Amino acid sequence: MTARPPESCVLAKDRPEEPVVPVVSPGPLVPVADFGPLDRLRGWIVTGLITLLATVTRFLNLGSLTDAGTPIFDEKHYAPQAWQVLNNHGVEDNPGYGLVVHPPVGKQLIAIGEAIFGYNGFGWRFTGALLGVVLVALVVRIVRRISRSTLVGAIAGVLLICDGVSFVTARTALLDGFLTFFVVAAFGALIVDRDQVRERMHIALLAGRSAATVWGPRVGVRWWRFGAGVLLGLACATKWSGVYFVLFFGAMALAFDVAARRQYQVQRPWLGTVRRDVLPSGYALGLIPFAVYLATYAPWFASETAIDRHAVGQAVGRNSVVPLPDAVRSLWHYTAKAFHFHAGLTNSAGNYHPWESKPWTWPMSLRPVLYAIDQQDVAGCGAQSCVKAEMLVGTPAMWWLAVPVLAYAGWRMFVRRDWRYAVVLVGYCAGWLPWFADIDRQMYFFYAATMAPFLVMGISLVLGDILYHPGQGSERRTLGLIVVCCYVALVVTNFAWLYPVLTGLPISQQTWNLEIWLPSWR
């Protein structure tokens, strides 16, 4: 949407008998100054209320399901490793496995909770639950900024609170919750950077500096993009799948720059992006994440007894043009061992798990993961036979809409050129599509934890379109509000129904059977 700046009027007469007609001199079109929502106080109040609700749901009975005091599912790896980090000067000795297969940040964060509350269920889950609460606040702020609506942002927060995947992930000491937090935070930083760059370009256009060169103006230091690089580095230092988001978000950031220069009348927007933005973007979203990743290994570098600390790689750096220090070569060797472990974790090599799944089942949560189940001597359900189980499963009222929501988002992106849906698709696909590159690999549905916030964002944008359809009358507006309220109520009800199997509450065998909606959930 554009508007013409006021210009001086000239008077013209084509014929002596015609009246004088004012003619406006053509001037450059100035994009509307829209750089984010304006209801700041109300926005923060709503964010605070939603965050308070998220705090209750994430921390209520957080340490209850611990399988007689021991970690559940893959907590059995990360809770002890975090305890080692806490008591071994920041590094793992890992005597049970002899191999560390993930970078250190997630375990360092788990160790914070264990340091405060001890080696128990609440302790090793505390930091993940805390960041799960902050994740809800981030999604509220991100969707509010993308949609320019505090109401739509609030809806997104409620939906994320009621998402089974995000809920269980925040309440278990697995690495995927930390990965999700960092990538969503980086995504939010890039969205703010997008608006900030447009604001600076707007000022430059009004000042007449946009046409000074064919490349357009410089936009100064972009601290939000720098912060995104730091967060992406922490994501990679949690799980290597953070690299996928570095690539997808890097491309998204450059697309933002090209679009901004085109929108603000730069003569050569592509050339301007190459000239002005590619190198700074590569520094912020390439070099900075790598530097942060290395920095997280500081305790490993400082240790004399860490795994492979002095096991220099066989061929790494020996004949290289730039000789590498032995410590770096040892880290390469250490990393290569972890990589070979993951590369060999395939079905063809005989690695199977009863709850593994493939990525084509993830969008609709067709094959969840059973984290824990106890059917022996369970009491407290009021029936003769009780079950206590915790399952990672997406709330069907949202996840079963994934395919139509993705299709609609694709239509909005390619046909309507709607950047809001485009960025949501970028985030969703970064957490999903790369896993198709190696279908033989053993995979689990909890890898889809990073997809959940972007699914919620997409659904929220659709609900926002229903609420704020251009040109709608009062009846149409009322109908849209009713539809949105009914849908949100359906999601909340669905979440409440699944709550026992998301938290491990005792339920009867009959109720357990009713909770299992699909054969593939067994």
Curated annotation (Swiss-Prot):
Residues 1-42, 141-149, 193-239, 303-390, 440-442, 500-522 are cytoplasmic. It is a multi-pass membrane protein. Induction: Expression is increased in infected macrophages. It is found in: Cell membrane. It is an enzyme of class 2 (transferase). Changing D74A: Loss of protein mannosyltransferase activity. The keyword Acyltransferase does not apply. Pfam families: PMT, PMT_4TMC. Its main location: membrane. Residues 64-119, 171, 261-281, 412-418, 464-478 are extracellular. Keywords: Cell membrane, Glycosyltransferase, Membrane, Transferase, Transmembrane, Transmembrane helix. One of its GO terms (molecular function) is dolichyl-phosphate-mannose-protein mannosyltransferase activity. One of its GO terms (cellular component) is plasma membrane. Pathway: Protein modification; protein glycosylation. The chain crosses the membrane at residues 43-63, 120-140, 150-170, 172-192, 240-260, 282-302, 391-411, 419-439, 443-463, 479-499. InterPro entries: GlyclTrfase_39-like (IPR027005), Glyco_trans_39/83 (IPR003342), PMT_4TMC (IPR032421). Changing L366A: Decreases FasC(His) mannosylation when expressed in M.smegmatis. The BCG strain overexpressing this gene (rBCG-Rv1002c) has the potential to be an excellent candidate for a preventive vaccine against tuberculosis. Two compounds containing pyrrole analogous rings were identified as significant inhibitors of MtPMT activity, affecting neither the growth of the mycobacterium nor its secretion of mannoproteins. These molecular cores could therefore serve as scaffold for the design of new pharmaceutical agents that could improve treatment of mycobacterial diseases. Disruption phenotype: Deletion of the gene leads to the loss of protein O-mannosylation. The mutant has severely impacted growth in vitro and in macrophages, associated with a strong attenuation of its pathogenicity in immunocompromised mice. The keyword Transcription does not apply. GO terms for biological process: protein O-linked mannosylation. Coiled coil: none annotated. Belongs to the glycosyltransferase 39 family. This is Polyprenol-phosphate-mannose--protein mannosyltransferase. It comes from Mycobacterium tuberculosis (strain ATCC 25618 / H37Rv).
